[in-house]
Amino acid sequence: MTSFFAEFVHTSDGVTCSDSGLMDLSTEEECSGAVNYAKTFNNNARYRWEVYGDMYPKGCFISESGNMYFNKYTGSARSSFSGISICWKGNT
């Protein structure tokens, strides 16, 4: 693992960064920059696009199929979408 990858960490399926005491990636650019890290646990990882809605996890997330998205929604509603969040390593 390179030092760049060491900056990222991912959650279990359905668990958000904040649930884990981790920091959300805050921009679409940060999320698309995490693709190589995501490929360490999902060979199909590829960044797709930005989304906005309370049905998705906040910040950067990856689906089981490998599609990665950045959710701009900042509200407090809980996600009903199953996905793995990609976070910055470190505490909030």
Where are these regions (language model features)?
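Intrinsically disordered, low-complexity segments enriched in Ser/Pro/Gly/Ala and basic residues
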Residues: 2, 11, 25, 62-64, ...
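Disulfide-stabilized extracellular beta-strand modules
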Residues: 49-75
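Long, compositionally biased alpha-helical segments
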Residues: 22, 28-30, 73-88
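Disulfide-rich extracellular modules and peptides
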Residues: 19, 33, 62-64, 72, ...
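Short, structured beta-strand segments at or near domain termini in extracellular proteins/domains
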Residues: 1-9, 78-92
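Secreted/processed peptides and extracellular or luminal domains of membrane proteins
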Residues: 23, 37, 66-67, 91
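Disulfide-bonded cysteine motifs in exported proteins
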Residues: 12, 26, 55-57, 82
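GGW-centered surface loops in extracellular recognition modules
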Residues: 4-49
